[in-house]
Amino acid sequence: SSARLEATVFSYDGKDFTRTKTTVLTAEGKSAVGTKLDPAAPAYKALAGGHSFTGEVTAFGKKYDGSYAPLTGADGKVTGALFVGVAK
């Protein structure tokens, strides 16, 4: 079987990265839209600082090899992020 590619678009309000569009499912098998990126996640600090993050991440009990990239406005402030990953 081929690996499933997952993708997420996050909005950022200065405190939370919230999943606004995603193919990622929760542990219960429901869409993860509306859930937040864990502030303890390694990607959170990088994204909040305007930096990308690539590595192994865990979401809803599943491990992924993935990359996150910040989205910024014209003023350079972080407004969101993108995630693309493959479940391990």
Residue ranges and their predicted role:
Residues 8-14:
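Short hydrophobic alpha-helical segments used for membrane anchoring or interfacial signaling
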Residues 1, 20-57, 72, 85:
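Extracytoplasmic/periplasmic sensor domains and loops in membrane signaling proteins
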Residues 58, 66-76, 87:
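A short, hydrophobic, proline-anchored segment that marks a local hinge/packing element in signaling
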Residues 80-84:
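Sensory beta-strand/linker motifs that couple input domains to effectors
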Residues 63:
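Beta-strand residues that line the small-molecule/cofactor-binding core
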Residues 2-6:
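Helix-loop-beta substructure at the N-terminus of cytosolic sensory domains
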